[in-house]
Amino acid sequence: MARVGIVGGGAFGTAMACVLRRADHEVLLWAREPEVVAAIDGEGVNTLFLPDVPIAAGIRATNDLDETVRGRDFLLTAVPAQHLREVTGRMRAGLREGTPVVSCSKGIERGSHALMPEVLAETLPQAVVAVLSGPSFAREIASDLPCGVVLACADAAIGAYLARQISSTRFCIHRSDDVTGAAVGGVMKNVISIASGIAAGRRLGENARATLITLGLEEEIRFGVAKGAQPATFLGLAGLGDLMLTANSLASRNTSLGVALGEGRRLPDVLAERRQVTEGAFSVEGVAALARSLGVDMPITRALDAVLNHGCELDTEIARWMARVPGAAA
């Protein structure tokens, strides 16, 4: 039995707490919100972020970040991407040298345009960084439905250890050493899912959505390779698998955001209605900026950035993108 700390009391952090508790580990879950701690400890459910899903018995929640970090065999971070640097900066003093820290956040940091494992490497230099990614809706994980994910770690021994500790017959882990690829897959599936949702909201048809998703995967591969990732990663669970799930489901916050935008709603209005973070909305700008600096052609991402961040008309950008589809008329 391992002593595990989970940093982040949202839906995914809670779901992973269930996975680890079912594996008979001692699990301490840190949440920023006092009401989340009270609900988990008192009612056995995260009423704020994962309502109506009873969580595994024996999970303890706390608002004390230092208690969550000190003396743990390994940690999982599941906080929104834009808060990761601040939270992990507070963890540094209490983290033992060589402690594995697994990033579960799927985003890119605004301003620095850093991927999540890059943020962890900067804020927690004493940690062994890993990434958990793949097709994994939190509600299904918490409900103990089958799931397959990728655990990426450059240290093969630590990666094997983490896979043994986390995996089960219902939560299957595929190991990888491509930390960058796993992180890029988690970012890009959110970006492309917004585009897929826009196509649905604009009633462009299933053919157009399939085209968007396929060409979006090509953008993901080009971007990942430019960042140093392995191309094969994007044909597995952390790439194609996660993209298939997210871009085709209205249960995805990113796809449903795209649908709302396609129906003519304004981005600030949609985001204001949501308690949980829609990571893709904050990732588009960073991916577009990185693509420009790396010289990577990413027309879907560029069109999204124009609409979400620069006030461009949606139909104009759709027409411009369609003119770029291979084989389209000039």
Model-derived regions, located:
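NAD(P)+-binding Rossmann beta1-loop-alpha1 motif at the extreme N-terminus of oxidoreductases
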Residues: 1-53, 63, 90
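General beta-strand structural signal in soluble alpha/beta enzymes
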Residues: 103, 128-133, 173-177, 236, ...
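Internal alpha-helical scaffold of NAD(P)-dependent oxidoreductase catalytic cores
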Residues: 83, 94, 119-127, 146-233
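Rossmann-like NAD(P)(H) cofactor-binding subdomain of soluble oxidoreductases
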Residues: 55, 62-146, 162-164
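NAD(P)-dependent Rossmann-like dehydrogenase/reductase catalytic/cofactor-binding core
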Residues: 189, 196-200, 225-235, 239-330
